[in-house]
Amino acid sequence: MTEENPWKTLSTEMKYDNPWIQVNESKVINPAGNDGIYGVVHFKNRAMAIVPLDDDNNTWIVGQFRYTTNTYEWEVIEGGVPEGEDLLIGAKRELEEEAGLIASDWKMIIDGCQLSNSVSDEIGYAFVARGLTVVDANPEETEQLQIRKLPF
């Protein structure tokens, strides 16, 4: 088995673009030698997850309605960090915005993980945050969040 790319790209066309994603469609020859198409979603932000832990090993999750799945979801605290912004600065912002928490001790636990590499190039990062102080949450205007504290 070789690690060389078995796909051949014949052409690529941008099909959709907005401030968060770009969708490209490529005409390809697949590894079986057949003509085909392949769609790729390019994410313009990096995905960031934060697991806050207090001194009693409690954590926080946020609940919100997700348009994509048409369901209410309970999730770790997460958000997007633009290219060029320091990952830790973005993580601190998301923790305060979504959960109303400020942390004094940060440890990166995921340093670049492909999240859905069959259809997108989204890369995810994650931190554990400790030394917590509670402040007022300040979610984005489109986020209607519930916050739950629970044992880790």
Model regions: which residues?
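Short secondary-structure junctions
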Residues: P6-M14, K107-D111
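NUDIX/MutT-family hydrolases
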Residues: K44, P139-F152
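Conserved Nudix-box catalytic region and its N-terminal flanking loop in Nudix hydrolases
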Residues: T2-P6, V41, A49-R93, L132-V135
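Active-site segment of metal-dependent pyrophosphate-handling enzymes
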Residues: H42-N45, L53-D56, R66, E75, ...
